[in-house]
Structure formats: C-alpha cells, structure tokens
Amino acid sequence: MKVWTIANQKGGVGKTTSVASLAGALAKRGKRVLMIDTDPHASLGYYLGVDSEEVPGSLFDVFVAHNHLTKELVKSHIVPTLVDGLDLLPSTMALATLDRALGHQEGMGLVLRNLLALVADEYDVAIVDCPPVLGVLMVNALAASQHIVIPVQTEFLAIKGLERMVKTMEIMGRSKKTRYSYTVVPTMFDKRTKASPAALQVLSEQYGESLWRDVIPVDTKFRDASLAHLPASHYASGCRGVKAYERLLDFLLAGEFGHVKIG
C-alpha cells in the first residue's frame, strides 16, 4: 500500500481538496483508497458528507487504544463515503486535545504508521490529510508517509508557509535520523493575475528540484463538488481542475521524485 501525506503549515492552500481529488481520481481507476483525516477541524469528513459528530468512532479513539491496536479495531472506525472504493478514517475535535492528553507517552509518533500496517492489505493507497499545526498528529502523518505532497497557493504569503513546512521537515528529519521525500504542488493558479505567475517563478527558483512542473488551476467546480459531498472527479470529471489532479496522480504513481529528499 502506498502512503501519501498532504501537508502544509499554512491553512487554505488546498490540502483537503487535494486529498479528495487524488482519492477520487484513484477510485476512478479502480483503486481502493483509505483517507485519514488528522485535522481536528474535520474538513475532509464534511467535504465528503461525513459528520464527525455522528460517527461511532474516530481517529482519536484509535490513538487512545494505541497499545492494543488490532485490524478489527481499526476497521471498526473506518466509514464509507458516497464513492465506491473510497473510505475514511474520520477526525473529531477531540484530536485537538491529543498532544495534551497523550503526547507525552512513548511511541505516540508511530501510531498512524502502525494502524496503516494493519489494514495495508485492504487498500491500494492511503492518503493523509495533515493539520497545519506541528504536533503529535503532524509527526504521525510524516512518519507514516512514503511521500509528502505540499500544496502551495500561488501567492506570496503561502510561500512563507512553505518555508516553515520545509524547515519543520528538516528539523524532524535530523532529530529522527530519517529523510523525507516531498513534492511542492502549486495550487489555485490564476494566470489572469500578476501574483500567480510571479509566485510560480519564485517557487521555481527556490524549490526547482522538488517542484511539480505543472499547476492546479483555480476552478469553481471544486467548491461545487464539496457542496455535493463528492470528489470533483465524480462531480465534474471534464473540468480543468480534475484534469490537473489526474496529471499530478500520474506523476505520483510514476514515483519519479525519489531523489527529492531532506533530512
């Protein structure tokens, strides 16, 4: 099972949209996909029509039981979405208390990796929606991942967020004696503005080797798809945003980014 984490320490850059869009594109190709929402705001669940307050269990409950994980326990907290082949391990606001409640316990940084190993034979790909805050959840998301996708809105404030994210991975990589493989993905690109092309140029200059050589354009169909609780691939399959995520998926599946590592 492939494991990808979608992460950035700035909100509003397209993380949740990227998770839903990549997962939807994979489902269109007949792949079994597990999405894991590690953000206490539970945006991914709401996007896909899963109310975090109505689910019988959540990722928080799995963390609480981290010393007694079984495949059956993990599967009992996974819920289906409206799309065949797309499942979700949902978040709740209780995750916001995780650092205070359990963060000091030994082994808490590997809970997500361990739970994914238990269901690895059930799915082709797992995609993690990462919170923007550095803590136990982000540590888990990065540790569990084989590759990290960093969506960056093509505007200058978002580039500052990218700098913090890369610095975080560098620090964590050194402390854990590991190396993180990542790709920077320009999102919300609007060629009609001066800001988007200018920001893209800066990204190319600063992150050339790790930058995906394409963009995710601004597309109102993403908002419409979330209203319908569907990935855009299952709502407006011909739109330019969906086609861009199809190209990104091809890139990720090809695995041509192995040389881009930090740590």
Task: Tell me what each language-model feature is.
Residues 1-263:
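P-loop NTP-binding core
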